[in-house]
Amino acid sequence: MKKIKFIVASIAVCMGITAQAQETKSAEPKGKAIVQTFGNFNADFSKDGDSHGFELERAYLGYEYKLDGGLSVKTVMDIGKSSDVSDLQRIAYVKNALVQWKQGKWTVNGGMISTTQFNFQEKFWGYRYVLKSFQDLYKFGSSADLGISAAYKATDWLSADAIIVNGEGYKKVQKGTGLCYGLGATLTPVKGLQVRLYGGLNQGATADANTLNTAAFVGYKADAFSLGAEYNYMDKAGSKQSGYSAYATVNVADNTNLYARWDEVFAGNTVSDPLRPSGSSPLKRDSAAAIVGAQFKVGKYIKVAPNVRMQMDRKAGNNTYEGYVSWYFGL
């Protein structure tokens, strides 16, 4: 009997040690490297165009580390083009340097964080390495900034978020005369259908120098395809700009997608502007763009996306046609 009790006690102790070891292992911090590179080969097929060549658009290098208690830290460097220097040069910026706390229905971010103005639309579009999303491409706002954000998932079909940042973007982190405030809501009324609403105010030195942003998005995603459309409006100190973007993806095979997108931009000005004088209509067609292409996944880390682009300048009446082979490498 004593031997049996000893054996049972030994097994119980071993099970306790094993369970404790498993619990300790699951609670151990986990980290991962962030490595992403965007590039392409492009050629201009326009009437007077003769440019062609390889281009390294952007590289992201960083690290993310998950701690216990729902905490994680993330730092990412963005090496890419800048309007401050020659197109042949590349500059490194801190794109993310943040702490995230995630617990239950709450997610809170602080530091150099991703903004909420068009992050949802960019993920739905899904081809950031090929072409920026509408608001990013036409300078409606910045994709990252210094500040804090909080999101709350009220139900399975409704979540809300708020953000307060400097309003200068991640390339100009100094504080200005005001802050940028944003409120958003995301709805999923039925499976696959997604609706996103956003409104933001970027304070200027005076009330008439403020920038107002509003955005609405509707998208549907299924296993075989996805469809999305967004409308965006910006009033920057009286200079108004708006536009919409519609895009679609069809999954034709496990590693092959077809995609297309159409952008339309409208611009106007309430003040004197010789290029866009005020008329009966405050917003006039300014430009449009179209892109059609395919994406091929080569293994786990590489994507290749040949595509054709057309840009239409309504003001000048010129069209440009370009061919691209975009590529992505990421861990």
Segment roles from a protein language model:
Residues 1-26:
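Cleavable N-terminal export/targeting peptides
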Residues 115, 171, 297:
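Short, electropositive, low-hydrophobicity segments enriched in small/polar residues
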Residues 169-173, 183-184, 198-199, 203-206:
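Short helix-to-loop capping/linker segments positioned immediately adjacent to catalytic or ligand/cofactor-binding
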Residues 23-167, 177-179, 186-193, 247, ...:
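Outer membrane beta-barrel
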Residues 142, 173-180, 206-213, 217:
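Short, contiguous, pocket-lining structural segments
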Residues 26-29, 34, 38-50, 85-89, ...:
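Outer-membrane beta-barrel pore domains
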